[in-house]
Amino acid sequence: MEKSSGEALIRQFASLDVLVAAHGAGVTNIIFMVPNSAVYELFPPFWQYGCYRRLASNVGVLYAKDTAVGVKGRECDRDPNSLYCQYNGIRDRDFVMNVTVIERRMKKVVWEVWNKKYHVVL
C-alpha cells in the first residue's frame, strides 16, 4: 500500500467489499470505498478510540470492530492514564487476535455487505 500511486490506491480501495485492518492511519483510505462496503477494524488490548467508526459512517461504509485480549505494556506502570502509556504501552504494541472471533465477525460482515451492497441474501 505504501508504494502505490494515489490513483492505484483509490482504485484498490474502491474495489474492496471488506477491508480487515489493524487500527492505524491506513484505515483513513476507507473514504475511497463504495458505500455499503465494510471495514473490520482490529484494536490492540485496551484501545478504545473509535475515529474510524465515525469516518465509516460519514462515507456510508459499514463498520465492525473487535479488540484483542492482552496486557498493557510496562510503559503504563508509572501512570496508566498518561499519553505515554496510551501510545507506547497500548496503541503501538503488537497484538494477537483470536481466530474464532475474527471468523465469527467476518461471517456477519460478509452477510451484511452482500445483503446491503448487492441485495443478495445468503
Model-derived regions: residue spans:
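N-terminal targeting/anchoring "stem" of glycan-biosynthesis enzymes
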Residues: 1-122
